[in-house]
Regions:
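Hydrophobic/aromatic beta-strand elements that line small-molecule binding cavities or substrate pockets
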Residues: 81, 96-101, 114-116, 130-136
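Bacterial Sec-dependent N-terminal signal peptides
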Residues: 1-30
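Short, low-complexity N-terminal intrinsically disordered segments enriched in polar/charged residues
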Residues: 23-57
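A solvent-exposed, acidic/Ser-Thr-rich amphipathic alpha-helical stretch
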Residues: 52-103
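A short, structured loop/turn motif at beta-sheet edges
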Residues: 101-108, 123, 135-141
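A mature extracytoplasmic/lumenal domain signature
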Residues: 59, 69-70, 113-116, 148
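Short beta-strand edge/turn micro-motifs at domain boundaries
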Residues: 128-155
Length: 155
């Protein structure tokens, strides 16, 4: 069982390094497109760090999330992902594969694959989603306004 766990960690590390290299090798993203992508990454970093203030800073005040067939606002997300998440050993590592990113003045939309390795209560799972986010530019900063998430795999 420990060998299997170690093997899973090694495979996950290889995938993470490969995707990081792939994302760094991606050519052709404009500065604006990269800023949109980084806004999404920072939002998920705040979520991973269980930092509700930073999470709110990366979202519009009227953010809506479409998760598991439900419509959530920012308070629902904070409650489910931060407030109720009391595991002392919680760790979440996110890996993104950006598929498309479009910008038009103060609005942008981005589609990506998200893979999250999550440790909670000494158990590690990996969840993969396909997501599309709509962002608005507020005071020269991109913020997530809508996020639609489709669960692809959980193991």
């Amino acid at each position: 069982r420990n060998k299997l766990r170690t093997l899973k960690k090694i495979v996950l590390l290889i995938i993470t390094i490969s995707l990081s290299t792939f994302l760094q090798a991606q050519q052709g993203w404009t500065k604006d497109q990269q800023q949109v992508q980084q806004a999404v990454v920072r939002m998920f970093e705040a979520l991973s760090n269980r930092d509700s203030l930073s999470l709110k800073a990366h979202c519009t005040a009227d953010t809506t999330l479409y998760e598991y067939g439900q419509v959530w606002n920012i308070d629902t997300l904070i409650n489910k992902a931060i407030t109720l998440n009391t595991a002392g050993d919680f760790k979440r590592t996110n890996t993104f594969e950006f598929i498309s990113t479009e910008t038009d003045k103060n609005i942008a939309w981005v589609t990506y694959r998200l893979s999250s390795a999550i440790t909670r209560d000494s158990k590690q799972i990996t969840i993969q989603w396909l997501e599309t986010a709509l962002l608005n530019k507020e005071k020269k900063q991109w913020k997530v306004k809508h996020l639609h998430s489709t669960l692809i795999e959980r193991n």
